[in-house]
């Protein structure tokens, strides 16, 4: 049964930070694992680094190809005694998410497997002392430490950047969409993977800017010049697999050549990508021209910029995004003469902590926006839905059209990831943003006289910029964050649509803990969450301000019969957070460009000029009670 399989998987993930350097001798290894074990244990595995990725791919392909579940577990158990710790978790997670006989099984949360990537080193140190000083206590709880102070204005946003949920989401997204995914080897296509790479990261940047404005800071300034000195950042994390700290970055450093790639390569790749965008086509490795058209252009570009194995010409266009992460992570020790750990930018489960992550991704996003500029703005015909009119939009919460945000406490279990030498439970108490429950109320008139199938799209954006000027539609468009997207059948006449925030198509509702999974909770073959991928529910709404920050809530209904994609399976598995994560083994269930209608430039100077009858815009306030 699924529960039995889940129980057999769990021990593989326990106490990985305590593995020794000894490896299984070559003659005792399974033939299929002869090529792995190159990256030493204790090294920080990076799924942005080409060499690390190549070995990880060899491992997950071997695990994916195991003939049955017993064989799979046998291979995993061997691999655990051979390969690098981080690579092991990455490869096993990719295999579990994609093997048919693993449907319904959930990989334990990464924050419990490697708590050292999420919890400050000082806090783990204190937990260690408490555990050894109180061996008789059943459970120990320590408070998470602060990692900075207000001398650094960016510290105001640490609640967002260092949030455990969003960092875990980023890790999971890159497991669902590995850069080295090869459809011919794996036998499955990843629909619109390149476009999803663009959209998911664009949304993270839009969310970050909303948080900045909530805190009275200006929107971020994108990275744009490969020689520019970067701001400083100190992660306060120590990797327990090596005992080395994640490198801090003093202020004023700029990126340097690495042994694998030069800064000049990055400059050249950027120029080539921008040339391709201006010419509206790329050149593949056989010198054929492939157009960057409306339907596939963003997807093709996403594969090239990331770059993934589906890049049409990696020799020519390089791997701009991935090497950018690696260069920034190795900024203080580019040639490894001091044998330091890289910084947090090297790893998907830690990179969101660093302010440069967002500035780097806005730089990447600006390249995509150049491509989007080559298309005409949406016409009224493309935006409208004849016969359908949105009459009213409101938020139903304690106070109408006001959403309250607050700081909540949660606990994270450390003892599965860290071996404290006792059986007791050791937990960290940490604080995170959250919001009160609310529902959307949308009143729609269907004047067509017939039933209509609609897709309801809900977005949110700040109304004013940092200087309190009203944002113009084209400037505001890149700040719109998707809150929900769902199907609704409109009966003729008046329809009142009520939708709970918990049903959002971007968030994951519940993350099962190590203990719950071990006890078989929530384990079933038809679970709908793409298996732990999704924006955390508690971070759905930006923080807002104490006096109530003004946002605009945008609702649009489009014709579902035109949006729908052929060949979708009836009951998609893992489709809880479909907007950011897609659905498992299925096509992306919306034909429109991701981010529609805000993915192309808007020429209208006012909202009234842009709006069509099937859209609604309403002012709401977000109030922070901190």
UniProtKB/Swiss-Prot annotation:
Residues recorded with modification Phosphoserine: 374
UniProt binding sites for Cu cation 1: 170, 174, 201
Pfam families given in the database record: Hemocyanin_C, Hemocyanin_M, Hemocyanin_N
Gene3D superfamilies referenced in this protein's UniProt entry, alphabetically: Di-copper center containing domain from catechol oxidase (1.10.1280.10), Hemocyanin, C-terminal domain (2.60.40.1520), Hemocyanin, N-terminal domain (1.20.1370.10)
Coiled-coil intervals, chain numbering: none
Principal localisation: secreted
Top-rank lineage group of the source organism: Eukaryota
Subcellular location: Secreted, Extracellular space
Binding site for Cu cation 2: 321, 325, 361
Sorted UniProt keywords: Copper, Disulfide bond, Metal-binding, Oxygen transport, Phosphoprotein, Secreted, Transport
Modifications the protein undergoes after translation, according to the UniProt entry: Three disulfide bonds are present.
Molecular function GO terms recorded: chloride ion binding; copper ion binding; oxidoreductase activity; oxygen carrier activity
Tissues/organs with expression: Hemolymph.
One GO term describing the cellular component: extracellular region
Function: Hemocyanins are copper-containing oxygen carriers occurring freely dissolved in the hemolymph of many mollusks and arthropods.
PANTHER family found in the cross-reference section: LARVAL STORAGE PROTEIN/PHENOLOXIDASE, PHENOLOXIDASE 2-RELATED
Subunit architecture: Scorpion hemocyanin is a 24-chain polymer with 8 different chains identified, assembled in hexameric substructures.
Similarity-based family: Belongs to the tyrosinase family. Hemocyanin subfamily.
Other facts noted in the record for this chain: The two copper ions bound each have 3 nitrogen ligands (presumably contributed by His residues) and share a bridging ligand (possibly contributed by a Tyr residue) in addition to binding oxygen.
Entry protein name: Hemocyanin AA6 chain
Species of the source: Androctonus australis (Sahara scorpion)
Source organism phylogeny: Eukaryota, Metazoa, Ecdysozoa, Arthropoda, Chelicerata
């Amino acid at each position: 049964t699924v529960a039995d399989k889940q129980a057999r998987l769990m021990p593989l993930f326990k106490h990985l930070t305590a593995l020794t350097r000894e490896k299984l001798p070559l003659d005792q290894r399974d033939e299929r694992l002869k090529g792995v074990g190159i990256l030493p244990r204790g090294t920080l595995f990076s799924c942005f680094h080409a060499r690390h990725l190549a070995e990880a791919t060899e491992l997950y392909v071997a695990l994916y190809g195991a003939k049955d579940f017993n064989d799979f577990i046998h291979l995993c158990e061997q691999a655990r005694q051979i390969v690098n710790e981080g690579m092991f978790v990455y490869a096993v997670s990719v295999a579990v998410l994609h093997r048919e006989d693993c449907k319904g099984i959930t990989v334990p949360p990464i924050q419990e497997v490697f708590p050292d990537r999420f919890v400050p080193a000082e806090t783990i140190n204190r937990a260690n002392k408490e555990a050894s000083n109180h061996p008789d206590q059943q459970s120990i709880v320590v408070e998470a430490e602060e990692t900075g102070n207000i001398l650094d204005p960016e510290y105001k946003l640490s609640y967002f950047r260092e949030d455990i949920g969003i960092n875990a989401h980023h890790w999971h997204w890159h497991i669902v969409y590995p850069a080295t995914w090869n459809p011919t080897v794996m036998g499955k296509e990843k629909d619109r993977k390149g476009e999803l790479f663009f959209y998911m990261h664009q949304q993270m940047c839009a969310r970050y800017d909303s948080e900045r404005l909530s805190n009275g800071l200006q929107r971020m300034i994108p990275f744009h010049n490969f020689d520019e000195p970067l701001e400083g950042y100190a992660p306060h994390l120590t990797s327990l697999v090596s005992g080395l700290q994640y490198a801090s970055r003093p202020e004023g450093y700029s990126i340097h050549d690495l042994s694998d790639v030069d800064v000049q390569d990055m400059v050249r790749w950027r120029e080539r990508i921008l040339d391709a965008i201006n010419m509206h086509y790329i050149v593949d490795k056989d010198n054929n021209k492939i157009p960057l058209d409306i339907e596939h252009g963003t997807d093709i570009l996403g594969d090239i910029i990331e770059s993934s194995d589906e890049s049409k010409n990696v020799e020519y266009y390089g791997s701009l995004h991935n090497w950018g992460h690696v260069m920034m992570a190795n900024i203080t020790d580019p040639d490894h003469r001091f044998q330091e750990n890289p910084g947090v930018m090297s790893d998907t489960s830690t990179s969101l902590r660093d302010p440069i992550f967002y500035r780097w991704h806005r730089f990447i996003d600006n390249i995509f926006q150049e491509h989007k500029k080559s298309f005409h703005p949406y016409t009224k015909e493309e935006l409208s839905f004849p016969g359908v009119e949105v009459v009213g939009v409101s938020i139903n919460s304690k106070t109408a059209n006001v959403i309250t945000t607050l700081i909540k406490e949660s606990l994270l279990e450390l003892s599965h990831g860290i071996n404290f030498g006792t059986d007791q439970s050791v937990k960290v108490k940490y604080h995170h943003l959250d919001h009160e429950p609310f529902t959307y109320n949308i009143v729609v008139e269907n004047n067509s006289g017939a039933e209509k199938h609609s897709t309801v799209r809900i977005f949110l954006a700040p109304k004013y910029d940092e200087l309190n000027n009203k944002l113009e539609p084209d400037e505001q468009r890149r700040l719109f964050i998707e809150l929900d997207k769902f199907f609704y059948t409109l009966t003729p006449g008046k329809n009142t649509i009520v939708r709970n925030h918990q049903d959002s198509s971007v968030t994951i509702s519940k993350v099962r803990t190590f203990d719950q999974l071990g006890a078989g909770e929530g384990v079933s073959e038809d679970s709908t969450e793409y298996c732990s991928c999704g924006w955390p529910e508690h971070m759905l709404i930006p923080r807002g301000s104490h006096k109530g920050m003004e946002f605009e809530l945008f609702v649009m209904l489009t014709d579902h019969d035109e949006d729908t994609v052929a060949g979708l399976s009836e009951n998609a598995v893992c489709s809880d957070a479909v907007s950011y994560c897609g659905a498992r083994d299925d096509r992306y269930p919306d034909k429109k460009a991701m981010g529609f209608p805000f993915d192309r430039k808007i020429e209208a100077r006012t909202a009234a000029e842009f709006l069509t009858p099937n859209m609604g815009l309403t002012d709401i306030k977000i109030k922070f009670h901190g």
